[in-house]
């Protein structure tokens, strides 16, 4: 929670009263106060949240699914109460972060998409959450886009008549489906292009020179890439980045692209794949 004041005394009065309210209602367990330039630490931590969550060990990971749902701020408490009940029915843990002040909390269920149950829950959680968001007249994608993940549920969210208008508009302006095909209309099933393979066999991964036992193996390490592209740093933004990308600005030279390559290669250790190599 961010406070502003013309003087340090006024600012101190505001956050002191706020902390007292939290303590009175037994909300929270720590109340750190950051002043001036120190506030950047809090915002940096929030930005790093996605990458930090991807460092959990094992195949059960927080997934992008319902993290972009948004409702009116006054409806957010009731929405979150009902969403929690949905997730409890599936017996899944979840993480929550981001901007409550805009009516949007990034809720990420922790699922194992390499198991059949995880994939079924993946679809059903989004289906039930879509109905919940619709109930509160919210948005499935309050900050970003529906895309291939949520596009399948646009007819459910908007209604068939409105969706038919979307299709008609797309046909008029892009009859050949050149621009961003399958993102808003005629979207393929949400689980048609999952990056993970339920049949992954990690027993035949080759020995590597470097030790990746802390991440279990090199495949698990490559799977930690969330795809968010935070690695695409330049001399202007600062931060560590491969010099090859700094020079070429080519996606294939990014850390993300190399993680994708390793995941695709080591994730398909079938006999047919071995023969192709």
Pin down the residues of each PLM region.
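Ferredoxin-type iron-sulfur electron-transfer modules in oxidoreductases and energy-metabolism complexes
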Residues: 196-277
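Terminal amphipathic helices with adjacent charged low-complexity linkers/tails
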Residues: 2-60, 64, 98-100, 125, ...
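Extended, hydrophobic alpha-helical segments in both membrane/secreted and soluble proteins
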Residues: 18, 73-83, 90-150, 162-169, ...
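Short, hydrophobic beta-strand segments
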Residues: 1-5, 59-69, 105-115, 149-156
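Polar, glycine-rich mid-to-C-terminal structural blocks
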Residues: 156, 160-221
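Flexible helix-coil linker/hinge segments at domain or subdomain boundaries
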Residues: 23-33, 129-145, 175-181
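A glycine-rich phosphate-binding loop feature that marks nucleotide/adenosyl-phosphate handling sites
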Residues: 32-48, 97-108, 142-154, 181-201, ...
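Accessory "access/gating" subregions that flank catalytic or transport cores
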Residues: 28-44, 69-88, 94, 216, ...
């Amino acid at each position: 929670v961010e406070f502003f004041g013309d003087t340090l005394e006024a600012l101190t009065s505001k956050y002191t009263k706020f902390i007292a309210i939290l303590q009175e209602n037994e909300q929270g367990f720590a109340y750190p106060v950051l002043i001036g330039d120190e506030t950047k630490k809090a915002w940096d931590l929030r930005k790093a949240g996605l990458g930090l969550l991807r460092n959990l060990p094992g195949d059960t990971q927080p997934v992008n699914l319902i993290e972009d749902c948004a409702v009116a701020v006054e409806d957010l408490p009731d929405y979150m109460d009902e969403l929690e009940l949905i997730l409890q029915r599936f017996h899944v843990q979840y993480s929550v972060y981001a901007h409550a002040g805009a009516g949007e909390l990034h809720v990420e269920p922790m699922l194992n998409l390499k198991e059949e149950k995880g994939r079924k829950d993946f679809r059903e959680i989004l289906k039930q959450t879509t109905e919940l968001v619709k109930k509160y007249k919210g948005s499935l994608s309050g900050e970003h886009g529906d895309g291939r993940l949520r596009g399948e549920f646009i007819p459910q969210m908007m209604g068939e008549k409105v969706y038919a208008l979307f299709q008609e508009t797309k046909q008029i302006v892009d009859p050949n489906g050149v621009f961003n095909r399958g993102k808003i209309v005629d979207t393929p099933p949400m689980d048609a292009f999952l990056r993970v393979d339920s049949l992954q066999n990690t027993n035949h991964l080759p020995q590597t020179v470097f030790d990746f036992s802390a991440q279990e193996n090199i495949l698990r390490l490559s799977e930690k890439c969330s795809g968010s592209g935070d690695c695409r740093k330049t001399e202007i933004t600062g931060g560590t980045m491969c010099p090859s990308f700094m020079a070429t600005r080519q996606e294939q030279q990014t850390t993300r692209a190399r993680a994708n390559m390793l995941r695709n290669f080591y994730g398909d250790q079938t006999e047919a794949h071995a023969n192709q190599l």
